[in-house]
A protein has these predicted regions:
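A substrate-engagement module of RecA-like helicase motors
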Residues: 2-11, 15, 19, 61-347, ...
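N-terminal pre-P-loop "Q-motif" helix
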Residues: 14-33
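Motif I (Walker A/P-loop) of helicase-class P-loop NTPases
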Residues: 49-58, 227-228
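A contiguous, basic/glycine-rich beta-loop/short-helix subdomain that forms a polymer-engagement track
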Residues: 320-344, 355-364, 473, 477-649, ...
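Conserved interdomain hinge at the start of the Helicase C-terminal
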Residues: 581, 651-689
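Conserved helicase motor "Helicase C" RecA-like lobe of SF1/SF2 P-loop NTPases
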Residues: 687, 691-701
Length: 701
């Protein structure tokens, strides 16, 4: 069947794109259109790379939508062909082909109509919610001013002693009391809100899910924020009001970045935040009837959560915008972003969230028929290694062993036989790790090496655990969520044993409640004081790594410099073994960066079945590799490289390490920069070999 092609990009936000920008947009467009394509595209920093990638990819999404409206059969519709004929059939009668085209066009029209109505509804409701929030904020301000004014008057008329302030009932004023009641009603968190409202109870309509989804990943959230800024400058990001090309975008991040609940966010470590969030989302009650308080930004806030999701889809938001809006509307940005993900045309997320299979699955990211783009891809191989690395210290495994023993002793009469069996295996494995690491410390007296390398199988044999089925244990830990239970109970026990604290603890004992100035504030304990939650997750990560093939990685057992502690660390050797899951599931994978050279080495690490050294286009049985590298947008006529051997006063410019601290040399460099600035109308940029030398020169100047 014919493929979509595009040579011009009128949606590019600037009048005349550079030739290399047009070429990059074409390459991205073509890689997205050709299913099972691996694109490796190199474009120098400062050439508008991110904008070109966005326009190329989103133009493809828009063209696919328009092709469906024309009734064209696309490559991703073969399996859903209702007529039951093969795409290769050329003997179909004209009336059957005409009917098939008309049916697809009708179906596409209906889907587009529903999707368009849904998008219009989202934008209208987001606008209405924004208006309501503004009115509410203004009303809050006026009511507070009225209450404060009344309170000030009372203080001026009736000065109280400290004793009276403690025991005397507040003076009653009907006006101020009415204002207080209005304020309470206005600020109430809709606790009587019906969780089964029609607005939120409707199931996800698969027909409204985008046919194609672009997943753009970068290393940091700040880089993704820059992508949002570029998107807003295009018609796809809402630069033109009510444009049919506008897409829905969703920025995905972890709880640590999006949590707006101070009692949870103040916990510090990501592991504690995750555990606490899961506890509060369940809103259970203990046997002593001490409720684990539900999160006020999630529980009975379903309408606000829906409105936040709709606002996120209505116009592009980075995670800072989403978190700020969530705090204002008292709705959880993390769960709003997750619920927005299925309906988004463009998904923005950091490397780690997509590369790690379990994280990707927990977020609900579906790679099928999606085009995955990795920006700044020179970091990609390291990101794969980091995502699947694991490390645990002797102190951590001791802590986990203590928690496991306490947990089993407490609940052994209520645990099923299967749970007890797996927990016994986990306990024996943890105890074996403790033994090996203690032995490693004892080797200090024998002058043994501080670090040694071993294979996965040899390490398990050394621990006496080579008969343990790591796959079965890993599956148990993943499906039972027992690690979360053990960590939570361990935190509860730790809180109960903390005799040094005389105040209150919150529901699960993770946060101290301290009275400050008449108010109770949540005070997070030192995350390094007893990091039990992180210890459990560190051990589960190591077990997950030990289920790898023996050739995929190695185990490093090492002591610290003091010889009082030891650790075991898994390092991944074969990035392709993990990255191939993304390649196999996604429609196409595109790597983009300013400097990807040497490209053959990058390809060999991520796509070893392809040989990139021979051609710019490599075909294999399953995938096609497309490579492209362009020059800079600066014309050659605008470049004049000059080597300056001496300065204006004849001082030789010797910037070797031993001579560059010479004061006379630094002064001569200053004269050169001063002269260059006088004749350069746009200013001058000066690059130094190190930050320290730049600071030294700047201080002298």
């Amino acid at each position: 069947m014919p493929r979509l092609r595009r040579t011009e990009f009128p949606t590019f936000p600037y009048a005349t794109p550079y030739a290399i920008q047009i070429e990059l947009m074409r390459r991205v467009y073509d890689a997205a259109e050709r299913s099972k394509t691996l694109g490796v595209f190199e474009s120098p920093t400062g050439t508008g790379k991110t904008l070109s990638v966005l326009v190329g990819a989103l133009s493809w999404v828009d063209d696919r939508r328009k092709a469906r409206l024309r009734g064209e059969k696309l490559d991703d519709e073969d399996e859903d062909n209702a007529v039951g004929t093969k795409p290769s059939d050329t003997n179909e009668p004209d009336w059957l082909r005409e009917y098939d085209t008309k049916r697809r066009k009708t179906d596409a029209d209906e889907v587009e109509r529903r999707r368009g109505a849904r998008r219009a509804e989202l934008r209208a409701r987001a606008k209405a919610a924004e208006t309501r929030a503004t009115l509410k904020t203004n009303a809050e301000k006026r009511l507070r001013e009225k209450i404060e004014s009344t309170s000030t008057t009372q203080r001026a008329i009736d000065p109280h002693t400290a004793e009276e302030n403690e025991f005397l009932v507040d003076a009653y004023d009907s006006g101020a009391e009415g204002a207080r009641e209005d304020l309470r009603a206005l600020l109430r968190d809709d606790e009587e809100e019906d969780d089964d409202e029609d607005d939120f109870s409707r199931d996800e309509d698969e027909a409204l899910r985008p046919a194609q989804q672009i997943i753009l990943c970068s290393r940091t959230h700040s880089q993704l924020t820059q992508v949002i800024g570029e998107l807003r400058s295009t018609v796809f990001g809402g630069k033109v009001a009510k444009a049919e090309e506008q897409v829905a975008a969703a920025a995905i991040a972890g709880r640590a970045q999006l949590c707006v609940n101070p009692a949870v966010k103040n916990l510090g470590s990501a592991a504690r935040i995750n555990e606490r969030c899961l506890e509060m989302s369940k809103s259970k009650t203990t046997a002593k009837d001490k409720a684990v308080k539900a999160c006020p930004f999630l529980s009975k806030r379903r309408r606000a959560l829906l409105e936040l999701k709709e606002a996120a889809l209505a116009k592009p938001m980075d995670i800072e915008d989403l978190a700020k809006l969530g705090a204002t509307r008292k709705a959880c940005p993390y769960y709003a972003a997750r619920s927005a993900l299925p309906e988004a045309d463009l998904v923005l997320m950091p490397y780690a969230s997509l590369l790690h299979a379990d994280t990707r699955e927990s977020l609900g990211v579906r790679l099928e028929n999606a085009v995955v783009i990795f920006d700044e891809a020179h970091n990609l191989v390291d990101a794969v290694y980091n995502s699947y690395g694991a490390s645990v210290t002797l102190e951590q495994v001791r802590d986990v062993l203590d928690m496991l023993t306490t947990y089993v002793d407490r609940f052994k009469t209520r645990l099923s036989a299967s749970n007890l069996r797996y927990l016994k295996v986990l306990t024996n494995l943890t105890r074996a790790f403790v033994t090996v690491l203690q032995k490693e410390i004892a080797e200090v007296k024998k002058s043994a090496p501080e670090k040694r390398l071993t294979s996965l199988n040899d390490f398990l044999f050394e621990c006496g655990q080579d008969t343990v089925n790591m796959f079965s244990l890993r599956r148990y830990l993943k499906e039972s969520k027992v690690a979360h239970k053990i960590a939570s109970y361990g935190e509860r026990v730790r809180a109960g044993d903390d005799a040094s604290w005389g105040g209150d603890w919150d529901g699960v004992g993770q946060v101290k409640i301290e009275a400050v100035g008449g108010s109770k504030l949540a005070i997070a304990p030192d995350p390094n004081a007893n990091p039990r939650v992180s210890a459990v997750h560190a051990l589960t990560s190591l077990i997950d790594a030990l289920a790898s093939a023996d050739t995929d990685g190695r185990i490093i057992v090492e002591r610290d410099e003091s010889g009082t502690s030891a650790s075991v660390r898994f390092i991944l050797l074969d990035a392709a073994s993990r990255f191939k899951r993304v390649v196999q599931q996604a429609r196409s994978v595109i790597l983009v960066g300013g400097t990807l050279a040497p490209i053959p080495e990058l390809v060999s690490q991520l796509f070893p079945e392809l040989n990139a050294a021979t051609s710019k286009t490599v075909e294999s049985s399953a995938h096609a590799l497309k490579m492209f590298s362009c020059g800079h947008i600066i014309p050659r006529d605008n470049l004049l490289p000059l080597a300056v051997p001496v300065g204006p006063t004849g001082v030789s410019l010797d910037f070797t390490h031993g001579a560059r601290s010479n004061v006379a040399l630094i002064d001569e460099l200053g004269r050169i920069v001063l002269n260059a600035s006088r004749i350069a109308p746009g200013g001058a940029c000066v690059f130094f070999p190190s930050f320290k030398y730049a600071d030294d020169v700047y201080e002298r100047w």
